[in-house]
Structure formats: C-alpha cells, structure tokens
C-alpha cells in the first residue's frame, strides 16, 4: 500500500496555503457559553498558575515559548462557524459510522464523521481523544475539521466515560495495557480509510486527558500517528506530581499512581520516558493560568525533541487556564490546530462554509 507523501517539517510555511474567508452569511456573535462548556470553567480548581520547577523562571519560559497569533481570516471563519451554532452549517449532524476496533480480546468503538468530499477519496484523518463518550449529533468541534476536509474520529478507548466500568478500565496499574488501544485505533483507522492503496495521513489531538493520550500516542507508540497536537497536557507525570499540591496529588493517586509507591508505573505511562522514539511533528499548547500543567516539564520535553532534530513546538498562552471554552479561545486554538495539521500533511487549508448544512 502507498502512503500519502510526507512533508518536510522545515517547510510548514510553504504548504497548507490559506484559501478561505469569513463564512458567506453574517451571523450573530457566538454566545458566551458554547455547546458542551463546563459549568466550573472559572473555578479555582482549574484556574490559577501553571507549575514551574524550583529554579525555573516563569517569565523566561513564557519568553521562550510566546503566544503566536493564528491567521486572522481563519480565526474569523471559525468564529463564524461557532456563532452559527448549527443553524445552517451542520455537516457534523449527519449520521455517524460506528467502527468496531479490536485490540486482542478488547473491542471498542470509534465514532467517525466523514465530510461529503471524502466519501470516496483518500482524506487525512484526525483522531480526537477525550474522557467523554462519543455522541452523534451537531457539535462545533467536528464541524470545524469536517469543513476543512478532515475525517473526524473519536475512539472510545478504555478510560472514556461510556460506562462506569469502562471509565475505570485504565486506572492505576491498568493504564499501561489500556494505552495499547491508542495503537489499535490507529491501525483500524488506517485500514478503514485506505483508498485505492493510499494510506491516509493520521493525526492525533486532545485536551487535558486527551492531550496526555496524544503525547503517549506520539511517543510510546511512535509511528502510529503522523503528527500530534496536545493541549493542557502533562509530559512527565512523576515530575508533575512532585510539583503540584498535596490535594491534587492525592486526587490523582487512583488514576495515575502514588509518586513514591508507584514510581515505575508513573515512568511507564509518562510521555517523557518514550521521547526518544518520536518520529513525527508534535505541538503543545499550555495556558499560563492552568494549575494542572507544568511549564518546566513541557519545556524539557520540547527541548529534548529539538535536540534530536524533531519538529516540536510549545506555546504558552498567558490568558488561558485549564478549560478554554470562551468563543475567542476556541477560535484561537482551533485555528492553530488547522494550520498545524494542514501544513504537516501538505494539504491546502480551505474551510468550506458554502452549500447546505
């Protein structure tokens, strides 16, 4: 089988040329609270200051990895799609495909949405990881990616909240084995969407828990995904737990492990442990007001990748906390996501706002 051609990581500015404008029909501004927003997005639990190791300078880390503005036209287009709220632009509301994926004796499903132009031809695929159980129906996030020409997949791997037992299926000592679902999902998606011998490019992305999954997919299972973008993610769990508060350390003991008692397990499930395996480009975006991430750990992770000549970037956004759900935050982040994946996959950046929803 042939795989779609690779793009040099040194040429991100020369590919994925922007071909778009604001959506053709004016719409009202997006509501202050968007579909799916958390009620506690502004609580002290998720808003504060990102962690830094003793001796590191928060100011220097922000200077080294500054906020960069995405393309203004793209951001405006995404804001228009968000404000439309599915009134006119509703590709994501079309019937979904539930793809069964086997990983040994474990079977999980992958919910897939396919844009109209990709029903017969090879298109890039994005796997979005989250704790939530995938659901059909309109949502602005898949709408963004579908209209940019991506097949959008949501693997319900062990740990997603599709049932109480399934949500706990990657807790503690189960996580090392459960993470192999990431590799299995990549195999299933490539097999399903190979067209006439052309294997699709496959990206991985997610926030928080999904961001951690993204980094594990790009490190421990290097080669399974062609590019990854992780937001609000942890790169080194043992280091993070040593920096955070005792309360959060206790709260995460069941999910990750205890730093003293389970040091080997934490090492095994940390992306930093497997960083030397990385083959594809990785981007990280963290908020300077996010108490659930370590800027120092992310900086060390990216520097190690760059020392190996890898395409790796980190952006620290001063205004962002852990949950970025305001319309302007959503448009900013997703503009960067689209620019990243189109440039690394060598496809034009076109966002289709025309025709029936």
Task: Annotate each PLM feature.
Residues 21-22:
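C-terminal motif of bacterial Sec signal peptides marking the signal peptidase cleavage site
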Residues 44-116, 137-147, 191:
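Non-catalytic accessory segments flanking enzyme active sites
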Residues 97, 119-194, 199-201, 207, ...:
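Cap/lid segment of the alpha/beta-hydrolase catalytic domain
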Residues 187-194, 198-242:
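Primarily recognizes the serine-hydrolase "nucleophile elbow" in alpha/beta-hydrolase
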Residues 226-227, 233-274, 280:
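Mobile cap/lid helix-loop segments that gate and shape the active-site cleft of serine hydrolases
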Residues 278, 284-286:
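Short beta-strand/loop motif that positions the catalytic acidic residue
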Residues 289-293:
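Acidic catalytic loop of the alpha/beta-hydrolase fold
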Residues 299, 306-357:
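C-terminal catalytic histidine-bearing segment of alpha/beta-hydrolase fold enzymes
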């Amino acid at each position: 089988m042939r795989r779609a051609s690779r793009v040099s990581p040194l040429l991100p500015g020369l590919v994925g040329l922007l071909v778009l404008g604001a959506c053709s029909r004016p719409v009202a501004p997006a509501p202050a609270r968007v579909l799916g927003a958390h009620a506690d997005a502004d609580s002290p639990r998720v808003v504060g200051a990102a962690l830094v190791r003793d001796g590191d300078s928060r100011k220097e880390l922000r200077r080294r990895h500054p906020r960069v503005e995405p393309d203004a036209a793209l951001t405006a287009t995404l804001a228009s799609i968000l404000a439309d709220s599915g009134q006119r632009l509703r590709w994501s509301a079309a019937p979904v495909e539930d793809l069964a994926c086997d990983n040994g004796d474990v079977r999980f499903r992958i919910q897939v949405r396919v844009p109209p132009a990709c029903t017969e031809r090879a298109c890039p695929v994005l796997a979005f990881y989250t704790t939530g159980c995938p659901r059909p129906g309109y949502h602005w996030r898949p709408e963004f990616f579908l209209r940019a020409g991506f097949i959008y997949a949501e693997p319900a791997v062990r740990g997603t909240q599709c049932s109480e037992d399934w949500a706990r299926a990657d807790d503690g000592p189960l996580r090392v084995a459960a993470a192999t679902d990431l590799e299995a999902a990549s195999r299933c998606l490539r097999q399903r969407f190979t067209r006439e011998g052309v294997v699709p490019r496959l990206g991985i992305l997610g926030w928080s828990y999904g961001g951690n999954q993204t980094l594990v997919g790009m490190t421990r299972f290097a080669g399974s995904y062609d590019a990854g973008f992780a937001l609000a993610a942890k790169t080194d769990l043992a280091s993070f737990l040593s920096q955070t508060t005792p309360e959060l350390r206790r709260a995460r003991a069941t999910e990750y492990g205890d730093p003293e008692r389970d040091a080997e397990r934490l090492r095994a499930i940390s992306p930093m442990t497997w960083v030397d395996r990385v083959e594809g480009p990785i981007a990280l975006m963290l908020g300077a007001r996010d108490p659930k991430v370590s800027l120092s750990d992310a900086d060390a992770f990216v520097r190690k990748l760059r020392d190996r000549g890898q395409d790796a970037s980190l952006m620290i956004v001063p205004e962002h906390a852990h949950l970025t759900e305001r319309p302007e935050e959503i448009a900013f982040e997703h503009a960067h996501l689209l620019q990243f994946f189109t440039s690394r996959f060598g496809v034009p950046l076109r966002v289709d706002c025309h025709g029936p929803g």
